[in-house]
Amino acid sequence: MGATPRSNCRVVDKFRLPPISRFTAILLAISIGLAAIGMGGWWWLQRSSPLHFQAEQLHEPAAARFLPRNANLSFYLQLDPNQLPAYGRAVARSKQRNSAANALTQLRNGLFATAGLNYNNELSNWIGPELAIALTASSNNQIQPSWVLALSSRTANGAREFLQTFWQTRSLAGGDLSISSYRGLGLISSSNPEAPLATALINDQLVLITSSRDALEDALDSSQVDALNQSSDPQLQNWLKQNRKGVALLRSDATGISQLLGLPAKLVAEEQMQQLVGSIAVQGSELQLAAQISTGIDRNDPPLGDRANQWLQQLRHSADQINISNANSSLNSLLTVAVTKPGPLLNELQRQNQGPLLLALINSNQWLAATDVANPSPEALNQPLHLAGFDPTSINSMDVWSRLSGQTNRAGELKAILAGASASKANVRWWSNNFDELQNQLQTKGVNKKAPFIDAKSVAFSQLGPKLSRDLLGHWSFWQGLQLLAAQPLSPAVNGLEYMLEEDKTSLDLKATLHFS
């Protein structure tokens, strides 16, 4: 037999890359290394810059497990308190950077001081980017609310070392301490009747400080039952599932809204406010609040739609206040306009209007309004205004209602008292109690590119200028408290406020923006 031919076992790899030189390999390694360093450096700069606050994604707070669900007001902060002054300096105008940083420093330090804590000496070197506080109001208004404060640690031993120093300092000051165990945790409390504080350490990473030992035991009891703590609160969970961005979470019930946040009890009762959950975000020098308020009212106001934005874009004036809402809206208690003397035209316009109405307050005595072009028609106002003593006439395609005063001007002509005037332009009917203001509006060309944008689903909108915003905040007890903590007035920095409302069955969705200069 002939010899069997040997098989060719050599495999030829058609896709083998050509060999690279050592120099090329070194260059490639250096390039990859530099790219990695660059990406890491970019990430580090983004995280270390206070401006990263603007892009933060909210997440479920670890402290939620230890905050009782029956607390009337809860606030979660998810940012590094040490960076607050730097953020204020970064977004403020050049001449106001120091004052902005100082205001945030004082406000931060003042907030911790209310709990008996010195931020610079006791907290700044270890406190982490998560903290929370829950407040429970007393049935006796003369008694301060009980509270639970939760502080995260950014270092391995910072929380434990803080507690040692915290109680050592207070023990040396003459306070008697009680050390015990509760639910497997070591509890330390003070017998000082003026400051009966209590503390516990959770896994070396979370410090609980409470206004009393009872409040601490209540918090620890709640942590063992999902139905009693906020970690499993469906309203809070549903809010977080919507991928909200921000630096803070807010949760409150009706008592917290009226007694602790300081909204008028009459307003809370009229709107039947029951629960509030929301988040706070920062964008430049703006503070943005998004919230959902559960109420006991079945709401069915129609959305404003695109016409609200069209009206705002056509509006020429820089008004002290602008409101847009539907006729007979259930939200009118939230949208009052401070017209000193509304006059018969505005009163009748508001009575007869059946659709949305834009009302701009030019100053305390002058107003400008917009409605759909034929709702109501000027003719529908003739009879009631005639009964009020004002007769209709037409001047340059404008409907005017006026009456003679019986007084004469320098030329000997009788003076006229104006109730107001109206004219249409671009499918919008404009109204005003000032003839010149209406003429100026009709002569406006183009659109206002700085006009705020309203979501199409919104049922109401309000915008306040600097003065009215400061006046409104100045009468709010919660704002007054913040100014006391900051040890300086905060209102002068306020540059405006706007908010819009949407409805969903028995709840209100609120979006508000507070502008700072």
Predicted regions mapped to residue ranges:
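Leucine-rich, highly hydrophobic segment in Treponema pallidum outer-membrane-associated proteins
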Residues: K14-Q46, Q54-A63, I202-N203, S211, ...
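Single conserved position on a long alpha-helix in the C-terminal lobe of the eukaryotic protein kinase
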Residues: F75, N121-L236, Q352-A456
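A short acidic, often aromatic-flanked loop/helix-cap motif at beta-alpha or helix-coil junctions
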Residues: Q83-L84, I257-S258, T408-G412, K467-R470
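Alpha-helix boundary/N-cap detector
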Residues: S99-N102, T114, S231, T340, ...
